[in-house]
Amino acid sequence: MHGYTILLEYKEQLLKGALVTLELALSGLIVSLIFGILACLGSMHKNPWLRLPAIAYTTLVRGVPDLIQLFLIYYGGQYLLNALTTRLGWPHIDIDPLYTGIFVIGFVMGAYMAESFRGGFLAIPKGQIEAARAYGLSRKSIFWRISW
């Protein structure tokens, strides 16, 4: 029982940490949904100017370890941003680690979500979409009623 009493001494810090974890997870989920949907729609588009960057994004991001991307974006992004601000004569900018974590989680998980969404969209039988067109549904209605 002595092991649990030590946790009570740090309950405020543990609760703050749990809230930061929830903030990071939920914010990262929202960012990853945005990246995932945009990359999915881009990778399925007929225009190569939209398709090729989306495919490159999902392939490259899923191929590089998450921790490497975190370090590259946090430290490399900080360095590049401050090199730019110094060149422009602006003051030094510090990037908040929490916001960097939210962005990196969203950026990385967005690539995985894009492939999951793309697989889901491609799994829809063509007959369902043809039937919706024959029924007279608009492309937007087909997307919301059948695809999504």
Regions found by a protein language model. Name each.
Residues 1-148:
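Transmembrane alpha-helices and adjacent helix-loop boundaries
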